[in-house]
């Protein structure tokens, strides 16, 4: 598949800068994959599309305030975006990074010391500190995507209502639409709710730069499927994934049989689905692995048609934008 098949035209004003208020007032496009039918709803109506035999799977990862500003010796500021712990040190994306050197001390927060350990390439460095998680809680900022204006309101909104397990550098944005009211409605409709963890890295939002989609190398992300969730999924008549991170978690487990580990699974058209029957997701960036996953789930032409309808109907796009519910795709098409 050529990467330019993931391109589409999007007016700048359709990129959402803040979530709907309340969150479940966002719009919901429902796409029935077998019939190719498209209908328009509000997200709080989601429970009417679910029922007994369904399992709705959430990613309960929590975004950490991973963006930190530090000072070099002699002055000069560097922005560090912490991506995860590696053997007693932390991998961080540094901007600017050309003046960093192994062994260089950095000062952050209230004079707390960090040390540059090793260059990893592509602007990434290993950094060591006495209590990096504590430092981030005290002095870190939320790592908003570059297309969202960094306001206090945006930072406060960049978390799902059910986030529990810290570890992500980016949010599982399909979950932004959920409220306590919607979750209660799902259970009242007879569906079960199950939870997994996948800690989202920045590679999730990285554009595909290779000409051939198959040549793209996927990032690794930690995932875990609790035993209770595994049983619920195995017993379900229909598995409804909330977001592409849940898809990658469940499909990684289904392929490997491993409930906890790291996944670099890249899902694009031609993938053989094993675990997911319905998908709730946002409207994604062009040339993204996320859009490739959605096309694999529902078919390229139908997804292109749905995106054209979304632009025409003025849906809101990207992290704080509206949602789509894809029914009868993925494993259901086998």
From Swiss-Prot:
Domain of life: Bacteria
InterPro entries xrefs: QueA (IPR003699), QueA_dom1 (IPR042118), QueA_dom2 (IPR042119), QueA_sf (IPR036100)
Protein encoded by which gene: queA
Residues annotated as transmembrane: none
Keywords on record: Cytoplasm, Queuosine biosynthesis, S-adenosyl-L-methionine, Transferase
Pathway: tRNA modification; tRNA-queuosine biosynthesis
Enzymatic reactions: 7-aminomethyl-7-carbaguanosine(34) in tRNA + S-adenosyl-L-methionine = epoxyqueuosine(34) in tRNA + adenine + L-methionine + 2 H(+)
SUPFAM superfamilies the record matches: QueA-like
Gene Ontology CC terms, in alphabetical order: cytoplasm
Physiological role: Transfers and isomerizes the ribose moiety from AdoMet to the 7-aminomethyl group of 7-deazaguanine (preQ1-tRNA) to give epoxyqueuosine (oQ-tRNA).
Similarity comment: Belongs to the QueA family.
GO terms for biological process, alphabetical: queuosine biosynthetic process; tRNA wobble guanine modification
Catalytic activity, EC: 2.4.99.17
Compartment(s) of residence: Cytoplasm
Binding partners and assembly: Monomer.
The protein's name in its UniProt record: S-adenosylmethionine:tRNA ribosyltransferase-isomerase
One term of GO molecular function: S-adenosylmethionine:tRNA ribosyltransferase-isomerase activity
Record-linked Gene3D superfamilies: QueA-like
């Amino acid at each position: 598949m050529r990467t330019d098949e993931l391109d589409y035209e999007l007016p700048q004003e359709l990129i959402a800068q803040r979530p709907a208020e309340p969150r479940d007032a966002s719009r919901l496009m429902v796409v029935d994959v077998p019939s190719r039918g498209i209908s328009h709803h509000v997200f709080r109506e989601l429970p009417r599309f679910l029922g007994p035999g369904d399992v709705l799977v959430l990613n309960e990862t929590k975004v950490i305030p991973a963006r930190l500003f530090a000072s070099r010796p002699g002055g000069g500021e560097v922005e560090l975006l912490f991506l995860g712990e590696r053997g007693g040190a932390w991998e961080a994306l540094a901007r600017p990074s050309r003046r960093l050197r192994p062994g260089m001390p950095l000062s952050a927060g209230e004079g707390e010391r960090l040390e540059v350990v090793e260059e990893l390439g592509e602007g990434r460095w290993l950094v060591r500190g006495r209590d990096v998680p504590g430092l981030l809680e005290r002095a870190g900022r939320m790592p908003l995507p570059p297309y969202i204006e960094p306001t206090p309101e945006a930072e406060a909104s960049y978390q799902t209502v059910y986030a529990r397990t810290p570890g992500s550098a980016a949010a599982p944005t399909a979950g932004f639409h959920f409220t306590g009211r919607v979750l209660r409605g799902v259970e009242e409709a007879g569906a079960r709710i199950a939870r997994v963890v996948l800690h989202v890295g920045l590679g999730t939002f990285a554009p595909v730069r290779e000409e051939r989609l198959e040549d793209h190398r996927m990032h690794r992300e930690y995932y875990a499927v609790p035993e209770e969730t595994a049983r619920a999924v195995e017993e379900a008549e229909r598995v409804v994934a909330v977001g592409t991170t849940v898809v990658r978690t469940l499909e990684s487990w289904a392929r490997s049989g491993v409930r906890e580990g790291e996944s670099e699974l890249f899902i694009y058209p031609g993938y053989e689905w094993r675990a997911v029957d319905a998908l709730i997701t946002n409207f994604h960036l062009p040339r993204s692995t996320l859009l490739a996953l959605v096309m694999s789930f529902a078919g390229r032409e139908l997804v292109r048609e749905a995106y054209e309808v979304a632009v025409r109907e003025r849906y809101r796009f990207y992290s704080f934008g509206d949602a789509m519910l894809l029914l009868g795709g993925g494993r259901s098409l086998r």
